[in-house]
């Protein structure tokens, strides 16, 4: 890349939602690139539009010198499979419409493939129409994640998904993966000659001098999970395993779950009010060092 070039980031989530792509955008901007973002109105993880934002068809705002183009977001997807399905389709359609009008002005397109691969279609539209260099940074692998969310693997669905995934990955010029294990999963779908770039997620630069938070009144061994509380995280197995511990060990231990997501209500019911399993909810990123140091 050359400085002063224009980069469009296509992503389902962006500030004020907390993901690594926020840091990437600011880093490129600080290096002299002109960075714009095409995304949705912010709703993650609660499925509701953040206070101070409106859910219009097309809106503009700005984050520390990065221009943001936002399109309408589906809300209420945490509690409805139908709405979750519409959520997958929504950005694919509205984002692609906007991409047709703004795509020509950019030198590079960078797709932050956080979840659904359908969210990367606006990037592919720009590639097809304007032949711009286009890269995906893959955080979640399709079609595997579709089945992991509970969709039954039928011959028809498998055929459709395989064709879609292959179409998407045959219309990019570069691909980065956040886990080396993704390479074998994606290899059947990428075009010949396309090399994998390994770009793992990194640890936050936290203030480790912060005083640890008191996670319990009594001295205990603390086990802590922090992140998205969804179905694919398989936290039910962790809770079930913790509940199988003898009472003596449980009283000396505490399982802390930090975060929010679509599976939170189910996991709270599963814990059955176990006093040694504590759900702390979503916490600020800058406060996480206090939890880590106490664990």
Regions found by a protein language model. Name each.
Residues 33, 187, 197-198, 202-220, ...:
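Acidic anion/phosphate-binding donor-loop and adjacent secondary structure
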